[in-house]
Amino acid sequence: MELEVLRFSSQKDSTNGVLFDVTGGIRKFLCYTLEDEYREDKVMGETRIPSGTYNITLRTTGGFHGRYVKKYGQMHKGMLWVRDVPGFEYILIHTGNTDEHTAGCLLLGDSQQANFGSSDGMVGSSVNAYKRVYPPIAKALEEGESVSITYTNFDYVG
């Protein structure tokens, strides 16, 4: 399975994007995304990860995993963990609404607020998006399929 995040707006506190399933060369929209902003020099918990392609595995330890087992029950097989990101660790794909919920992770949502002007950006209906997007990815991983995610920058970060 191949996923792609297209980042299209990076502002002072956040980056807006969209997530696609691009398996087999067909681009299928999955949901909107929100991450921390671009920074030349990383600030712990306040910086989006570099563009590139990374593998995803399931992480079955840690606080997020325990909370998601309670929240989502049998649907939850482990946190979607974006692996081997240079200078970053424990980058997860999870629910949340604003840049305050990201700490470098990728938030999913079914709606999105612009992140320019007085807004820091926001994704809405995050739990609904997660409940829809998570199961096929977790299933692919459980069946031994390789899952990758490519982060592509279409935003101006200069």
Locations of the language-model features?
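Cell wall/extracellular polymer interaction/catalysis modules
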Residues: 1-158
